[in-house]
From Swiss-Prot:
InterPro entries tied to this protein: RelB-like
Known function: Antitoxin component of a type II toxin-antitoxin (TA) system. Probably neutralizes the toxic activity of cognate toxin RelE.
Superkingdom of the organism of origin: Archaea
Keywords assigned by UniProt, alphabetized: Toxin-antitoxin system
Name of the protein in its database record: Antitoxin RelB3
Source organism per UniProt: Methanocaldococcus jannaschii (strain ATCC 43067 / DSM 2661 / JAL-1 / JCM 10045 / NBRC 100440)
Lineage of the organism: Archaea, Methanobacteriati, Methanobacteriota, Methanomada group, Methanococci
Known partners and oligomeric status: Forms heterodimers with RelE and possibly a heterotetramer RelE3-RelB3(2)-RelE3 from 2 heterodimers. The heterotetramer is probably not very stable in solution.
């Protein structure tokens, strides 16, 4: 079975691209800063939190 791709093509200027890239970088940096002290959970801990034992 073939899936049809439904992508629209559009073009942006180099300046617009760089602006979008800068915004994404700022968002990533903020997300990394906010989660730097978070503990990572194991798969089993996540299942337990969800009530799936």
């Amino acid at each position: 079975m073939r899936l049809k791709k439904r992508f629209k093509k559009f073009f942006i200027s180099r300046k617009e691209y760089e602006k979008i890239e800068e915004i994404l970088d700022i968002g990533l940096a903020k997300a990394m800063e906010e989660t730097k002290d978070d503990e990572l959970l194991t798969y089993d801990e996540i299942k337990e939190l969800l009530g799936d034992k």
